[in-house]
C-alpha cells in the first residue's frame, strides 16, 4: 500500500512539473514573438524543460504555473522532478485531477507582491481544501519573492494582509467573484475579535451558573425591557442578574457575559445598544404593540473640576548663586525665586585687587545667566534696595542690584559700590561708560560717615523715649485695674446690704413691696402685711415724723459743714 502511494505521489509530481513547464514556455513564446505563431513546446524531454526555464527567467513578467493535486493534504507539494513517461502521465491523470494556479509578478522588484487566480478551482475536492488551505511556493519560484496564497473551495482568492492588488489582471482566465465578508469584517472597527454569530438577533448569555437567551430587539435600558428568556420566563437584565445572585453588584453590563466577555464589551463595540432610562419605546414598556420614540443610552465622561491641580508638575525656580571673583574670601550671594538675597560667609575686599571684577551667576540645573561688567567705583555705600528684586533674574532683562552696606572694618576707606548688570547667557557685554552714583539716601537723609552715627543715635533716643512712654502707660493701666477691683468689691458689699434691708419683716424672705405710709417696712406679700399691721399701725405715723425731723436736722448740719469748708 505504501509503495502504491509513493508511486502515485511521484506520478502526480511529474505531471505537475510538466504542466508548469508547458505553461511557462507558452507564456515566454507569446511575449517574445508577439504576433507570430506559437511553437509547440509540449515535449516531455529534460532538454526542453531546461530551455523553457531559461527563457522564462529572461522574461520580465515571470509567469509560473503551480499544480495543485486533489489528493490527500499531506501530498500537496510543488517542485521540479524527473518527468515520467506517457504511461505514467496517463496513470496520474486517472488518479487525480490537476488544478492550475497561475501566479504573476505584477509589481516592482522590491515590492514582492503577487496576485493569484484559480483557473479550475471547482475541481478541487472539498475534503482537501476544507475552509482555507495555504499553498507554499517551492523551488519553481524565486525564494526572494515567496508569498502566501489562500485558496477557497468556491474559487475565490483572499490576499493576506499587506499585499497589493494589481491595477488590471495580467493573466487571462475566468475570474470568480469574491466572497462577501462576514459581518465582523464589514464592521472592522471592533475592539475585540467576535464570532460572526455575535451579529445574530439572539445571543446566549450567562450570569454565574444561570444561562439564558438575549433578544436584541427587546433590549431596553437594563432595568426595563424583559429581553432575556430563561426557560419559559422573560427577565430584564437586572432581574436576570438578581436571579443569579448578583443583585448587590447593580451592574448588569459586567455581570452578564457572552462568549466569556461581559456585555459591556458588546456595548463598546456597538453591537448592543441599550436604551436610556427615560426611553418610552415598546421594548422598555414591555408592550410590543406600542410605538414610542427610542432614546439610546449615551455614555458620559466625568468632567474635571476646575480647582483640580494639573497632573504635570510645576517647575520650581531654583535659587541662583552669585560668586564674586576675584576676592580674598569666597562669598556667595543666593537669589531665591521670591527675590531675597542671602549671603554665605563674610564679604571682604582686597585693597590691592584689580578694579575690574567679574560676577558669575550659576543656576542649577538649567543653564544660568551670566552677569558681567561689575565695576568697583569710588562712591559712598548704598543701603539695600528692599532685598533685591521681587522676581528672579532671567536672560534678556536689564536690571541692577545694589549690595547692602557692611561694617566699616570690612570696607575700604573709598566705600566701593558693586553693581551687577544682567546680560543674556553666552553674550558679550557691550562697553558702557560708568557714571558716578549719587549719595545714598535713608529716609530722605544723605548717608555719610558722621551723619550715619547721628542717625543711629537719634534712632536709639527715639527707642528709649518710646520705651519710657510705654512703661508709664503700663503703670497707669495697672493702677486703673486696681481701682476697678476695689470699686467692684465696694459695689458688691453695698448691694448685699441693700438686699438684707429689703427682706420681709414678718417672715424674713425677699421683700416685694413696702409700706405706703412710712416707706420703712418691707413685706413679701399682702398676707405678711395684714399679719404685721396690728403692731405696725401704732408706730407707722410717729416713726415717719421722727425720721423726717431727724433727717432735716442732719441735713442742716451737713450744709453748715460744707459752708465752713
Swiss-Prot record:
Modifications made to the protein after synthesis: May be phosphorylated by DNA-PK complex in a DNA independent manner (in vitro).
A GO MF label: DNA-binding transcription repressor activity, RNA polymerase II-specific
Disease: Vulto-van Silfout-de Vries syndrome: An autosomal dominant disorder characterized by intellectual disability, poor speech, motor delay, and autistic features. Most patients have additional non-specific features, including hypotonia and gait abnormalities, seizures, which may be refractory, high pain threshold, and sleep disturbances.
Start-end of Pro residues biased regions: 169-181
Biological classification of the source: Eukaryota, Metazoa, Chordata, Craniata, Vertebrata
Domain SAND positions: 193-273
Keywords, comma-separated and alphabetical: Cytoplasm, Developmental protein, Disease variant, DNA-binding, Epilepsy, Intellectual disability, Metal-binding, Neurogenesis, Nucleus, Phosphoprotein, Secreted, Transcription, Transcription regulation, Zinc, Zinc-finger
Region of interest (Interaction with LMO4), ranges: 403-478
GO cellular component: chromatin; cytoplasm; extracellular region; fibrillar center; nucleoplasm; nucleus; RNA polymerase II transcription regulator complex
Biological processes, Gene Ontology terms: anatomical structure morphogenesis; behavioral fear response; embryonic skeletal system development; germ cell development; negative regulation of DNA-templated transcription; negative regulation of transcription by RNA polymerase II; neural tube closure; positive regulation of DNA-templated transcription
Assembly behavior: Homodimer. Isoform 1 and isoform 4 may form a heterodimer. Interacts with LMO2 and CLIM2. Interacts with LMO4; LMO4 blocks export from nucleus. May interact with the corepressors NCOR1 and NCRO2. Identified in a complex with the XRCC5 and XRCC6 heterodimer. Interacts (via the SAND domain) with the DNA-PK complex subunit XRCC6; the interaction is direct and may be inhibited by DNA-binding.
Motif (Nuclear localization signal) on chain: 301-316
Modified positions (Phosphothreonine) in chain numbering: 171, 179, 432
MYND-type zinc-finger residues: 504-540
Protein name: Deformed epidermal autoregulatory factor 1 homolog
The organism of origin for this protein: Homo sapiens
List of residues binding Zn(2+) 1: 504, 507, 524, 528
Annotated consequence of substituting residue 202 to D: In a primary colorectal cancer
InterPro entries registered for this protein in UniProt: SAND-like_dom_sf (IPR010919), SAND_dom (IPR000770), TF_DEAF-1 (IPR024119), Znf_MYND (IPR002893)
Region Disordered, residue ranges: 34-62, 162-190
Effect of residue 264 to P: In VSVS; loss of DEAF1-promoter repression; loss of transcriptional activation of EIF4G3; loss of DNA binding; loss of interaction with XRCC6
Extent of the signal sequence: none
